[in-house]
Amino acid sequence: MKEVSQQKKELVNEITQRIKASRSVAIVDTAGIRTRQIQDIRGKNRGKINLKVIKKTLLFKALENLGDEKLSKLKENSGGQIALLTSDLEPTEIYKIIESTFQKTAPRGGEIAPEDIVIQPMTTGFPPGPMMTEFQKVGLQTGVEKGKIAIKKETVFVKKGETIPKDKAKILEMLEIKPLEVGLQLLGLYSEGVVYSKEVLSLTPERIANDMAAAFSQAKAIAKSSMFFVDEVLRDLLAEAKIKADALALAGQFITEDNVKDFLVRANVNAIILNNVLNKGSTQETPEEKKEEAKKEEKSPDESISEGLGALFQ
């Protein structure tokens, strides 16, 4: 017990010294991250950050030893599986590194499915045997193709929001299906007397500009709807008022210098329409004319011939 206690003291002292020597200190959540991924993160960022997985009690003890109230605030949001990240980089650079640690991975079992996990028809590469029973147990329709186990039908394996059972997690790993994305989650960062949250560090110039533009548009819309006269909306309000006034003048037959052309155009259009209607009416045959035309058509061929001969001697 004394040996274990001594090891803990040495570890706390090591952490304390590491924090003292670093410009920036962060606590990150490592839940769901496997040892291999931690090693990959260390390898890719060697010389930029130092990452050490540690028990909360030992880390909190080291923070207490430093006696810095602001630094001790890092304990407030620290829970679950955590690691200490130290660096001499700027807080924003550290945050970029943390965000870049996310990778696709297969579940272990017990995780919540972020989306529907769908298994498509495929040849698995496994020979027929006990494995076929394992696939069938979890609801997969299987067969044999070219001497290998094949999944015959598309299957919604786990629905969004459901807990992924261990037996299904095992199958997903065997099929190399990686529905989860895991990485370091920033819980808090301390640098040069200032404590930063994830929400603050996630702000980018582009996001700030977009948020400001959206806020300006919303404020402008409210000012216009409430008729609040400020420089930013005055031009729009005047333009809308003119459009409404012009429409009202036209509807009320009120002629002004601004709308006289509109009245002339309207009068011209109406004249054209009236002229077309009158011309159409004048070309229509009366009932008497139609009857006379019908009588002419009813004459026999002999009558037509005699009338023609008679006309020659008139």
Swiss-Prot record:
- What are the start and end residues of every segment in region (Disordered)? 281-314
Enumerate the InterPro entries for this protein: Ribosomal_protein_uL10, Ribosomal_uL10, Ribosomal_uL10-like_insert, Ribosomal_uL10-like_insert_sf, Ribosomal_uL10-like_sf, Ribosomal_uL10_arc
Alphabetical keyword list: Ribonucleoprotein, Ribosomal protein, RNA-binding, rRNA-binding
Give GO BP annotations, semicolon-separated: cytoplasmic translation; ribosomal large subunit assembly
Q: Which GO terms describe its molecular function?
A: large ribosomal subunit rRNA binding; structural constituent of ribosome
| Biased composition regions of type Basic and acidic residues, renumbered to the chain | 287-302
A cellular component term, taken from the record's GO annotations: cytosolic large ribosomal subunit
Domain of life of the organism encoding this protein: Archaea
Name the family. Answer: Belongs to the universal ribosomal protein uL10 family.
Q: Which HAMAP family match?
A: Ribosomal_uL10_arch
What assembly does the database describe for this protein? Part of the 50S ribosomal subunit. Forms part of the ribosomal stalk which helps the ribosome interact with GTP-bound translation factors. Forms a heptameric L10(L12)2(L12)2(L12)2 complex, where L10 forms an elongated spine to which the L12 dimers bind in a sequential fashion.
- Function in brief: Forms part of the ribosomal stalk, playing a central role in the interaction of the ribosome with GTP-bound translation factors.
What is the designated name of this protein?
A: Large ribosomal subunit protein uL10
Which gene does this sequence derive from? rpl10
